Amino acid sequence: MGIKHLYQLIEEHTPEAVKKGEIKNQFGRKVAIDASMSIYSFLIAVRSDGQQLMSETGETTSHLMGLFYRTMRMVDNGIKPLYVFDGAPPKLKSGELAKRFQRKTEAHAAAEEAKETGTAEDVEKFSRRTVRVTREHNEECQRLLKLMGIPYIVAPTEAEAQCAALARGGKVYAAASEDMDTLTFDTPILLRHLTFSEQRKEPILEIHLDKVLEGLQMERKQFIDLCILLGCDYLDPIKGIGPSTALKLIREHNDLEGVVEHIKSQSSKKLTIPDDWPFADARLLFLEPDVRPADDPECDFKWEAPDVEGLVKFLVEEKHFNEDRVRNGAAKLQKNMKTAQQSRLEGFFKPIEKTAEQKATLKRKADEKLEEKKKKQKVDAKAKKQAKAKPRTAG
């Protein structure tokens, strides 16, 4: 699920933190990809009449089809992907997982009913909600990646946290996930839409955490508290708190301790803290997630030539993929992996850290821009009000 409304809030309050570009802009970069999120997107995207793609023997192949072709597209564009799989979920997440399972069970029943009585849209909507990434899906995807020569790692717990640790440690340029909590786990750069299909024509979003914090004028701990207040996978949300209220509360009360105290002191009781709301535990999971450090021997990743015959055996003989397509894909992969060895020129130069004076100037300019925007909105609103109030003359 990630963090509710976080991207909307970033876009509104700190748009300079987001760069929009094409996949080719990521040429020569190593990227850590949240595998479970990608596999889930392949399972819900590659569907026809509410059914996943299947082999002749009735086995689901959507995840393998998506992984094979999207990974090839990345390598085609000079990217060196590595995939990170979820390990065991933290204990605090068990409540959220139980709720998800309940929703999927209900959705499955609704999907069956929709097949009998509903429209094609109903069938599609409810079928998507029943999709779950299984251990078998993960194991098959890991087998496929090994045959493709693409490295992967299983995280101790959350894949997003491990992706963030690899980006922070300089093993990769960025973490790629649709889950916004990857930013909460402290990835310097988050890429969204990287594994989307070309047909969707969605730009790659490159979100820079330092600019997010600078634009929101927050320290990291405050940002984590904001994310928890917006709604995360570890805790029930506080009903009635949307993105604007969450930002206002953190700015006014500095941290969650202050926010909770303020809410409890209100006589109107418009907002209520859930009985079991261990926000300090959730904060600690973001501050100190269980991850392998970037210098761990298991994080010594190598991109190798694909095992062409192994791919044919697995995808063609076992999963009944088209042999010509698999062989052509493997040949392209082999050729493009050599191209991906080239380094970007920027890799030879370290970015120059901004001075305190430069940061202050940037902040002042951003504040002035915001003030200007507010003034314009006031003038526009006043003009609109006057135009409405102006009496109409009889013709």
Curated annotation (Swiss-Prot):
EC number from the UniProt entry: 3.1.-.-
Entry note: cofactor: Binds 2 magnesium ions per subunit. They probably participate in the reaction catalyzed by the enzyme. May bind an additional third magnesium ion after substrate binding.
Leader sequence residues: none
Compositionally skewed regions (Basic and acidic residues) per UniProt: 364-383
Compartment(s): Nucleus, Nucleolus; Nucleus, Nucleoplasm; Mitochondrion
Residues involved in DNA binding: 47, 70, 158, 231, 233
Location of region: N-domain: 1-104
Span list, region Interaction with PCNA: 341-349
Binding-site residues for Mg(2+) 1, renumbered to this chain: 34, 86, 158, 160
Gene Ontology CC, one term: mitochondrion
A GO molecular function held by the record: magnesium ion binding
Gene3D superfamilies according to UniProt: 5' to 3' exonuclease, C-terminal subdomain, 5'-nuclease
Region I-domain, annotated ranges: 122-253
Keyword match DNA repair: yes
Cofactors: Mg(2+)
Pfam families: XPG_I (PF00867), XPG_N (PF00752)
Record keywords, A-Z: DNA damage, DNA repair, DNA replication, Endonuclease, Exonuclease, Hydrolase, Magnesium, Metal-binding, Mitochondrion, Nuclease, Nucleus, Phosphoprotein
Protein family membership: Belongs to the XPG/RAD2 endonuclease family. FEN1 subfamily.
Assembly description: Interacts with PCNA. Three molecules of fen1 bind to one PCNA trimer with each molecule binding to one PCNA monomer. PCNA stimulates the nuclease activity without altering cleavage specificity.
Protein name (Swiss-Prot/TrEMBL): Flap endonuclease 1
